[in-house]
Regions:
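Substrate-positioning beta->alpha
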Residues: 12-16, 25-27, 35-57
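Short beta-loop-alpha junction of Rossmann-like oxidoreductase domains
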Residues: 22-28, 79
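Amphipathic terminal alpha-helices
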Residues: 123-128
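Conserved beta-loop-beta element that borders a ligand/cofactor-binding pocket
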Residues: 1-22
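Short-chain dehydrogenase/reductase
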Residues: 1, 41-45, 75
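Short glycine/proline- and charge-enriched loop/turn segments
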Residues: 29-37, 88-92
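Mid/C-terminal beta-alpha module of Rossmann-like enzyme folds, strongest
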Residues: 52-108
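Amphipathic alpha-helical segment in the mid-to-C-terminal domain
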Residues: 48, 78, 116-120
């Protein structure tokens, strides 16, 4: 907010969730780890294809100013998601602490108001 309020030129800010695709995924860093916190928190991820598509839509729509969160509308719980992804990719399962914790679900729907933009990336990488 400070940056966007203090500049006198056009500025579009894209705030990305955790970036994923077939070759880039946070489970590779979490595999086999123990005592991970916040099992009931939600994941806020975005697929690479959605980032590319959002940039193209912003350019095509001639947007010069704005702040956009790019986050998949799918927000599974951390323990469920990372455990399933580790199993799917045949990696050692992560272990989560049994705690309630807090979570923050980031909304990425503002970008969907642009002509032609719809989230298409699959954060489950076709697991489901």
């Amino acid at each position: 907010s400070l940056l966007s309020d203090s500049v006198s030129f056009d500025l579009v800010i894209l705030r990305l969730g955790g970036l994923i695709d077939q070759d880039r995924h946070p489970i590779y860093h979490l595999q086999g780890r123990k005592d991970l916190s916040d099992p009931n928190g939600v994941v806020n991820l975005v697929h690479r294809i959605d980032v590319i598509h959002a940039i193209k839509c912003l350019i095509d729509s001639n947007i010069h100013n704005g702040l956009y969160n790019l986050v998949s509308p799918d927000h599974p719980k951390r323990e469920e998601y990372y455990t399933k992804m580790a199993g799917f990719l045949k990696l050692e399962l992560p272990e989560f602490k049994k705690e309630k914790g807090n979570y923050k679900e980031v909304k990425g729907d503002k970008i969907t108001q642009l002509q032609g933009f719809k989230y298409q990336g699959d954060i489950w990488l076709s697991l489901r």
